[in-house]
C-alpha cells in the first residue's frame, strides 16, 4: 500500500537540510543515513548517500532514474550465499 497523496512523500528533515546546504555550497560529500524510508527527491541527484543496511553503510550514488524511490531499495539487507554445493555426488546410488 502506497502513501496517501495528501500527506506527500516522506523524507527525513535533517537529511533534506544537509542536501540543501551542500547544494548551496556546491559541495559533494558522502552523507551517512539510517533513514531507509526516505524518498529520493530531485535535489539529491548527483550526491552519494551512505544508506545503512543493518551492518554497514552502503554508498548509493543518486541518479535521475532513482527519483521517487526509497533509499532502502538500493541497499539490500540480506546476503544470498547460494544454495549448498554439489550434494548429488555424495548420495548413494
From Swiss-Prot:
One of its GO terms (cellular component) is small ribosomal subunit. GO terms for biological process: ribosomal small subunit assembly; translation. PROSITE patterns: RIBOSOMAL_S19. Pfam families: Ribosomal_S19. Keywords: Ribonucleoprotein, Ribosomal protein, RNA-binding, rRNA-binding. GO terms for molecular function: rRNA binding; structural constituent of ribosome. HAMAP family: Ribosomal_uS19. Protein S19 forms a complex with S13 that binds strongly to the 16S ribosomal RNA. Belongs to the universal ribosomal protein uS19 family. This is Small ribosomal subunit protein uS19. The gene is rpsS.
Amino acid at each position: 500500500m502506497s502513501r496517501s497523496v495528501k500527506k506527500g512523500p516522506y523524507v527525513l528533515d535533517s537529511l533534506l537540510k544537509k542536501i540543501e546546504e551542500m547544494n548551496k555550497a556546491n559541495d559533494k560529500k558522502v552523507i551517512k543515513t539510517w533513514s531507509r524510508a526516505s524518498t529520493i527527491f530531485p535535489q539529491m541527484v548527483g550526491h552519494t548517500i551512505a544508506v545503512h543496511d543493518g551492518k554497514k553503510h552502503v554508498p548509493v550514488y543518486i541518479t535521475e532514474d532513482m527519483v521517487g524511490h526509497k533509499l532502502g531499495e538500493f541497499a539490500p539487507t540480506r546476503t544470498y550465499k547460494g544454495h549448498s554445493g554439489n550434494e548429488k555426488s555424495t548420495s548413494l546410488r
